[in-house]
């Protein structure tokens, strides 16, 4: 029996929703082919990732076996389509693909259990079980995390098109979290609450200009910009080119912008990066479906 699973990249935080908002996008994605085997084995292609015990897809699959007290094994062939350390939920997608592939092989359909195994994989990769990547990659669409334990998720019916720009810069999630303060000024917290609440309404109404204006953040971005000294200049160029707004995806360096002329916006940002001596690529994307077999 062979199972094929695709798990999409995600835009986590989505502006003011730090550790809460996340949206699946239609590309890129990680793909696994899972089959029965007498031990646990991983074969990977695409972007380079660890093999063996440190592979997140394999770790998540093994975690599900342990949770179910099932002995045995499986072989995973991973086609890594999401660049690691990109800010696009690379480890979360691998975790979802591995856990869901194992679940399908075992005939398990318990969403909560599968997500728990995937979040263990995400925790191994980044030090914390981030549901704002794992959950939208699993379910698709735009998700809001009410709580991690117990896991409570809300869904927003949002259909967006945007442009992702990915510079050739790596920002490990653990490093991006370490730079954050343990406390922030009250006025910054209040501002984020206002923006996040308004963003949900704008998403429901499909108000692109308002959504763009609200793609901002006072909790993490002011501190993480130290790891992205080019951000303010890139943001200025994007807005001048017609973007309604631009934000950092996850912990970066990937950027997500919305507007009308998405190809022009992406091309202009890439050209600006090249002026700064940084290679970059862009692609137009949209709200995506969740992991599927």
Curated annotation (Swiss-Prot):
It comes from the Archaea. Keywords: Amino-acid biosynthesis, ATP-binding, Cytoplasm, Kinase, Nucleotide-binding, Threonine biosynthesis, Transferase. Pathway: Amino-acid biosynthesis; L-threonine biosynthesis; L-threonine from L-aspartate: step 4/5. It holds the Pfam family GHMP_kinases_C. Its main location: cytoplasm. Its EC number is 2.7.1.39. GO terms for biological process: threonine biosynthetic process. Gene3D superfamilies: 3.30.230.10, GHMP kinase, C-terminal domain (3.30.70.890). The keyword Transmembrane helix does not apply. GO terms for cellular component: cytoplasm. It is found in: Cytoplasm. GO terms for molecular function: ATP binding; homoserine kinase activity. InterPro entries: GHMP_kinase_C_dom, GHMP_kinase_C_sf, GHMP_kinase_N_dom, Homoserine_kinase, Ribosomal_Su5_D2-typ_SF, Ribsml_uS5_D2-typ_fold_subgr. It catalyses: L-homoserine + ATP = O-phospho-L-homoserine + ADP + H(+). ATP binds at residues 83-93. PANTHER family: HOMOSERINE KINASE (PTHR20861:SF1), HOMOSERINE/4-DIPHOSPHOCYTIDYL-2-C-METHYL-D-ERYTHRITOL KINASE (PTHR20861). Catalyzes the ATP-dependent phosphorylation of L-homoserine to L-homoserine phosphate. Belongs to the GHMP kinase family. Homoserine kinase subfamily. This is Homoserine kinase. It comes from Pyrococcus horikoshii (strain ATCC 700860 / DSM 12428 / JCM 9974 / NBRC 100139 / OT-3). The lineage of its organism: Archaea, Methanobacteriati, Methanobacteriota, Thermococci, Thermococcales.
